């Protein structure tokens, strides 16, 4: 076999051929290597999974030595230069970049969920100590979303899953900005859905008293 690894067990003299796929062998293929019939089989020992791939992914490809990162086959540099954050989210979820009509629907569906229940701010976020770390506040708030949307537990319903995905993508910037501003003693800024996804996040983070926030163009 040209794409295989040949192993000779010096304990028994037995020889094994393990197929190599995409530069990897299956750990379970090692189980056939036994000293005798009572042997469980050879196991791979890799502390910290430093040289173990846990799964095959069609979403990302990473080659750290070569500096390669791809999402769904697209180089990350190309996506960073030519695509918006929400376009990349759509790509990761659906496998292809959205058409114009798909993007319009996708942006609408995400933007629809940017606001938080008032109790999330008044009864939950305001309950944190004044020097609580924003990351702890954010993680706690994300977990607390399940108490506001108990239907989210129905993971077998594809439509319901999509709604929860939309909620997470849309509400995470709102929660992150709210946690940050609370940590520095600044009042909460509501989402402004007239802005795009990134502009809205910057507005919620940095807006002070402007009637309408105008993000600095980069």
Enumerate the language-model features and the residues they cover.
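Hydrophobic alpha-helical bundle cores within soluble ligand-binding/oligomerization subdomains
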Residues: 2-218
């Amino acid at each position: 076999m040209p794409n295989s690894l040949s192993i000779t067990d010096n304990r028994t003299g037995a020889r094994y051929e393990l197929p190599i796929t995409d530069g990897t062998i299956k750990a379970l293929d090692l189980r056939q290597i036994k000293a005798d019939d009572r042997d469980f089989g050879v196991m791979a020992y890799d502390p910290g999974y430093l040289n173990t791939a846990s799964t095959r992914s069609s979403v990302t490809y990473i080659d750290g030595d070569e500096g390669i990162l791809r999402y769904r086959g697209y180089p990350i540099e190309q996506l960073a230069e030519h695509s918006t954050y929400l376009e990349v989210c759509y790509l990761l979820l659906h496998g292809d970049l959205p058409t114009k009509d798909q993007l319009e629907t996708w942006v609408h569906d995400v933007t629809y969920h940017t606001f938080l229940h008032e109790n999330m701010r008044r009864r939950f976020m305001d309950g944190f100590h004044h020097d609580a770390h924003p990351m702890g506040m954010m993680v706690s708030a994300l977990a607390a979303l399940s108490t506001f949307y108990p239907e989210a537990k129905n993971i077998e319903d594809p439509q319901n899953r999509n709604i929860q995905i939309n909620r997470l993508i849309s509400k995470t910037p709102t929660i992150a900005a709210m946690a940050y501003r609370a940590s520095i003693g600044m009042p909460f800024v509501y989402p402004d859905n007239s802005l795009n996804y990134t502009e809205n996040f910057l507005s919620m983070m940095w807006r002070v008293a402007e009637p309408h926030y105008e993000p600095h163009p980069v």
